[in-house]
Design a protein with these regions (language model features):
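Conserved acetyl-CoA binding element of GNAT-fold acetyltransferases
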Residues: 32-37
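Conserved N-terminal beta-strand and adjoining loop/helix that marks the start
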Residues: 1-18, 38, 69
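Conserved beta-strand residues within beta-sheet cores
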Residues: 6-8, 60-63
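A conserved beta-turn-beta hairpin within the catalytic core of GNAT-like acetyltransferases
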Residues: 26-31
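Generic C-terminal helix-cap and adjacent flexible tail
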Residues: 128-132
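Unchanged
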Residues: 39-62, 68-122, 126
Length: 132
């Protein structure tokens, strides 16, 4: 079985990073995450990230370097998570709350204290090590 691709984007504002809390309900309801989602069939990871950010946050981004990659399983399906740094097109805009009920800009050292979606721990661990 081939692995599906999931993408996440890490945006900075000063020294802080954007995290968003999923709406209540479902397996990840109420947990914090880096905005992103699953790539559609035939969609490249960077294209998927741009689309997902627009759908979830209403924000337009430029996708930068890959910063983390890891594997996890969701309902028995192997998924490859690829995280990229992203730059917001408008640095003074806040995200819309479409699939989330809250957002915050956090210092990377605070990531370990948040109730993050399990798959995003891969990304948080890389960010925490780099900011130590």
């Amino acid at each position: 079985m081939s692995s599906r691709i999931s993408v996440a984007g890490v945006a900075h504002r000063g020294n802080n990073i954007l995290v968003m809390r999923r709406l209540p309900g479902g397996s990840v309801g109420g947990l914090w995450e880096f905005p992103g989602g699953k790539a559609e069939k035939g969609e490249r990871p960077r294209e998927a990230l741009i689309r997902e950010w627009k759908e979830e946050t209403g924000l337009e981004i430029a996708v930068g370097d890959e910063i983390a990659r890891g594997e996890f399983h969701h309902k028995g399906v192997p998924i490859t998570l690829i995280a990229f740094s992203v730059e917001l097109s408008s640095t003074d805009s806040d995200p819309d709350l479409r699939e989330h009920d809250a957002f915050q800009w956090v210092n990377p050292r605070q990531l370990s204290r948040l109730a993050l979606v399990d798959s995003d721990r891969i990304v948080a661990d890389v960010i925490s090590r780099e900011s130590a």
